[in-house]
C-alpha cells in the first residue's frame, strides 16, 4: 500500500472514531431529555473517555504522547504568533455580555469539564493526528484537509439540539479557526496552545451572559474579521519559513 493511501485510511479512521464519540455524547442527552449541569457532565464524560483511550493507546504504541503533539513549543514561537493575543481577545469577547452565574459553581465546573474535554479531543484528532499525518505533504495541504474536516464535523451539533442555521455559521467559523490552529501547530510544534485556546474559547462561549441577536451578529462579525486577519498573518510567517527549504531543494 502506498504511503498516501495509508495516510488517507488513517485520516478516515480517526474521523470515524471521533464522530462516533461526538455523536454519542450529543445523542445520549437529547434522547434522554437531559439538560443543564447533568447534560454537560455526561457529555464531558463521554468525550474524556475518548481522550483517555487515545492517550493510553499512544503511550502503549509510541511510549509517550509526543506523537500526538504534546511537547514543548519551539523557541521564539510564542513571540512569532503574537503571544496568541488575537485568539485571547476573541475567546474573552463574549464576556462583554456578562457571565452567567445563575447555575453557580456547579454550572461553571460542569462546563469547564466539558470544554476541556472538547478542546483535548478535537485538537488531538484534528491537529495532532490528522494535521500531523498530512504535514509531510506540506503545511498548506495539512491545514486545508484538517480544517475542512474540522469545520464539517460541527454538523454533529445538530445531534445535540442545535439549529441548522446556527450550525452552518459554526461550520464557517470553525473552518477559519481550524486553519489558524493548524498554522499555530505547524509554527510552534506543540499541541498544548491549541488545546488550551480551544477550551478557553468554548468555555467563555458556554458561560457568557445572553445578549440580543443584533449584538451577537455584530460580535460574530468582529470576531471573524480579527480571526481572518490573524490567519493571514500566520500564513505569511509560515510561508516565509518554508521559502528557504523550498529553495534548498
Regions found by a protein language model. Name each.
Residues 45-53, 105-113, 121, 168-176, ...:
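Membrane-embedded alpha-helical segments of multi-pass membrane proteins
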Residues 53-57, 117, 129-130, 176-189:
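Generic transmembrane alpha-helix motif of multi-pass integral membrane proteins
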Residues 18-26, 88-97, 115, 147-157, ...:
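Aromatic-anchored segments of alpha-helical transmembrane domains
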Residues 8-16, 78-85, 108-112, 140-145, ...:
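Hydrophobic alpha-helical transmembrane segments
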Residues 30-44, 59-124, 131, 135-136, ...:
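Juxtamembrane helix-loop-helix connectors linking adjacent transmembrane helices
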Residues 1-65, 179, 203-249:
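N-terminal, membrane-interfacial amphipathic/helix-forming hydrophobic leader that caps
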Residues 121-147, 186-190:
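Membrane-interface helix/loop boundary segments of multi-pass membrane proteins
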Residues 167-223:
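Functionally important transmembrane alpha-helices
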Amino acid at each position: 500500500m502506498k504511503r498516501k493511501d495509508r495516510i488517507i485510511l488513517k485520516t478516515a479512521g480517526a474521523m470515524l472514531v471521533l464522530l462516533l464519540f461526538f455523536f454519542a455524547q450529543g445523542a445520549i442527552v437529547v434522547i434522554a431529555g437531559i439538560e443543564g449541569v447533568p447534560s454537560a457532565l455526561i457529555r464531558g464524560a463521554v468525550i474524556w473517555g475518548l481522550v483517555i483511550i487515545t492517550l493510553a493507546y499512544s503511550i502503549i504504541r509510541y511510549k509517550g504522547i509526543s506523537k500526538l503533539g504534546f511537547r514543548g513549543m519551539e523557541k521564539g514561537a510564542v513571540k512569532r504568533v503574537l503571544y496568541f493575543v488575537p485568539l485571547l481577545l476573541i475567546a474573552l469577547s463574549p464576556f462583554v455580555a456578562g457571565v452567567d452565574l445563575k447555575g453557580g459553581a456547579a454550572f461553571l465546573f460542569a462546563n469547564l469539564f466539558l470544554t476541556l474535554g472538547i478542546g483535548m479531543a478535537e485538537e488531538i484528532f484534528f491537529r495532532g493526528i490528522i494535521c500531523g499525518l498530512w504535514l509531510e505533504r506540506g503545511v498548506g495541504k495539512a491545514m486545508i484537509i484538517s480544517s475542512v474536516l474540522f469545520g464539517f464535523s460541527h454538523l454533529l451539533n445538530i445531534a445535540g439540539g442545535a439549529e441548522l442555521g446556527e450550525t452552518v455559521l459554526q461550520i464557517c467559523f470553525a473552518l477559519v479557526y481550524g486553519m489558524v490552529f493548524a498554522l499555530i501547530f505547524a509554527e510552534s510544534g506543540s499541541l498544548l496552545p491549541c488545546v488550551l485556546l480551544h477550551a478557553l474559547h468554548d468555555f467563555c462561549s458556554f458561560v457568557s451572559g445572553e445578549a440580543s441577536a443584533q449584538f451577537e451578529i455584530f460580535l460574530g462579525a468582529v470576531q471573524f474579521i480579527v480571526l481572518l486577519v490573524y490567519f493571514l498573518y500566520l500564513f505569511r510567517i509560515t510561508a516565509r519559513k518554508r521559502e528557504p527549504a523550498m529553495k534548498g531543494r
